[in-house]
Amino acid sequence: GNLRFGEKLRVGELMYPMLMVSSNDSAEAVAQAYDPGRDKFIKEMNIWVNSIGAYRTYFKDASGLSPQNVSTAQDLSIIIQWVLKNDPEILDITLLKSKTIRTHTWTNPTHFLNLTSYIGGKNGYTPEADRTSVSLFKIGKYKRTYGVILLGSSQRDSDTLDLLDEALR
């Protein structure tokens, strides 16, 4: 997110770099802004994922950079299904090609933005996890939703399209 120390952005504004470009500093800024404090924010993140049934997900930090952050494809499926049902506006942010707020412009690197079937998702990368992604598509006459979740992929985009193609056979 290229945030500067002392810069003031609203939590809602921080969602754009966090979801569009996986901004670690934005995620940490949201955690720091939480009134009881960062540690309580992370604790609440863990309580929340457990409350929706994502029992094998654990957050050590807000940004996702710690190797102690863990999840599974099944848990990520539970989380994205919750988002789709309860807060689909989050996905709208992931569909933006770019967003400018004051002096910042963030450009979404997702290669699926030009596909009309793509309805949103989130990419990530750490050396331990390699490239990860959750990608959602609405396809077919009945606009059925398909999710492709990749963990540890070195070819994230082509793997996503290959798996989606396989699911549609």
Describe each region flagged by the PLM.
Residues G1-Q74, L84:
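Active-site-adjacent loops and short helices of periplasmic peptidoglycan-processing enzymes
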Residues A54-Y55, P67-R169:
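Domain-terminus/edge residues, biased toward the C-terminal soluble/receptor-binding domains
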